[in-house]
Amino acid sequence: MRTRTQCNAALLEGSTVRFIGTATIGTDHIDSTYCAEHGITVVNAPGCNAWAVVQWVVSILAQINQHASFALTERPVGIVGCGAIGERLARLLEIFHIPVFRCDPFLETASPFRYTSLERIGRECSIITVHTPLTHDGAHPTYHLLDAAFFHSLKQKPYILHAARGGIVDDYELYEAAQYRRIAGYYLDVYEDEPDVAPALLEAAKLATPHIAGYSIEGKLAASRAIVKAVGEFFGWQIAEPQLEEKEDKTFIVGHSIGDLARTYDIVHDSRTLKSAPQQLEQLRIQYAFRHDFRNYHFGNQALERLVQDDC
């Protein structure tokens, strides 16, 4: 099922559904409380498209590195949410000696010296990238995590990158922060009122893509395999694993710089396409030609090669 499908009481009431499989990382489109109360098993595919989202971020970092007044190695990148995507991104950046501040209150308890607060990230980071799930309750809700108070507290005029879920960042306050130069600019792949997006929000973005940061061939295959396996285990079926005809030789990239990695994905093209037809966001997303992510490449940088290939 797609994230656009809201699996809640309105859809499920009176049905015989026992299992819901979503080939996505997020589950905010599923009413997990209702499902638990009615004995419906919910399975998602965490980490399936993590490298595709990391690729999206890296492509933006290469753009920033070309135009900013500082080098990436000179300023810390604040990563908000260090699950499947955030932690992979952090490890990749550390290979290139880019300082990283990790923020994840769910992980901070176990490793307090490894993580820092959102407030510190706001004070000290020149680039902030968001990778949390969207939650409205619990110990650390993320709805409007980046709100007016956050943007007014910023000290470094950072770049804001957002490819998690619409609603984690208050889009209106993000736009206002850019207009009043509290931030250096923003890059978006998700939107609070998606698929209806304010034209001004898109126009002011440095780059904007139609919710496709995680759309890679390798990610789609990984998600399909995970859900097929889960369905088989739940119903006791033997199901053939989805296969992809892989190239005999993966493309080789030196991989000694962020710029090298950015050549694997033309994010500027995707942004131009959306900005030229913002009302077509949903159609652009549906018709998107899935790209290859880092798992399709071999790297001369051995540390990077190990990080990516050991995760395949």
Regions found by a protein language model. Give the residues of each.
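Phosphate/diphosphate ligand-binding glycine-rich loop within oxidoreductases
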Residues: 1-68
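Rossmann-like adenosine-cofactor binding region
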Residues: 7, 107-199
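Active-site regions of enzymes building and remodeling cell-envelope glycoconjugates
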Residues: 15-19, 39-41, 111-119, 202-210
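Glycine-rich adenosine-cofactor-binding loop
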Residues: 46, 54, 73-94
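NAD(P)-binding Rossmann-fold cofactor-contacting core
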Residues: 95-112
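Rossmann-like dinucleotide-binding domain for NAD(H)/NADP(H)
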Residues: 157, 163-312
